[in-house]
Amino acid sequence: MKKKKRHTLLKFLILAVMAGGVVLYSGVLQDTGGFPGQIRNQVYVEQKNAKAENYPGAAEKKTEKRTEISTENGTPEIEVTHGYAYETLTAEQQAVYDEVYRVIMAQDSKVKVSTCKEKVLEKAYRSVIADHGEIFWVSGYNYTQYTMGKKIVSIDFSPSYTMGRTERDYYQSQIDVVVDSILKNVEPSWGDYEKAKYVFEYLAGNIEYEMGTEQNQNIISVFLNKKTVCQGYANATQYLLTLLGIPAVVVTGTAEGDTHAWNLVQLDGAYYFMDTTWGNSSYNNGESGFSSFINYNYFGVTTAEISKTHQADGTLLLPDCTATADNYYVREGKYITEWNPDVVGQIYGTAYQNVVVTEAVRFLNTSLYDQAKGYLIFCLII
């Protein structure tokens, strides 16, 4: 998909920058004859693997749920990690979620799931993927339906692995080193907002958006290649926030007509949307010189705000996000709702004195924006 370009004030002042969308995943469905059932192949592009560490604040959260279930073939018990998507499922879908997660983590070839409904299986699989941005060794799945006459009596689920267990373990060890180096900078005193802002800034500021990079639908491209697309950004955001004890899930859909992925996160007990891809200035303004600018317009936004550009595909039942306390501009005191030259002057004057290359401020309306721009220009702040 093509990059979208938006331009606001040049040079020192950056105001309310908007970004563009990227490719998420493609789906393939094939039917072939089989006895006594049918085989259908589906491919979704998303990734995950789960590894919990004791990073500051990780143990304080209560939303993550785990279930220990023994596998039928006697392999070691797999601790099933549940996230936001799991909580939106029916009891039947939740049971299949556990079965899908278990076989993926064990990297077994197949499992007979406890449903005969292909839509239930698809919902469970996509929910596992949405909850687990760390799974990078699966690109989709095959399923085999077994029938008696016209009645489906059972379904086998077979993950489509992109690598063997040895290669997976190798990549995971490399990812662990990078992730540890990122999260070691998190301060024990930080709350949800500070942790989420750190993850957002790290990914938006250090990972380049590039369509053609290898493994761009998973976290390998993010942590090892430092180049990715929206799916990689969203998966990495979910993974890092989960390790920090912040509930997060990957949301898929479209943004300005292009397939896209972003995140739903819970900060201080309230839900917000976050789009790390659109936080990367090089994605939108790579040709205008703002290579180090971070766009905060999609950090901690409401449903009403994100719906102007993003449309979820219905995979997840999403809440109506109305909280604004942890929106970047509100939290940082950079959301201007009424004209006050002293406030605006102080924000940009401080940034100028601190040699901040760009400063982002959001205004309630165009009239306030124009007032601020004129005021700053005539006061020779820029």
Segments (PLM) and residue ranges:
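Catalytic cysteine-centered active-site loop
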Residues: 210-217, 227, 248-258
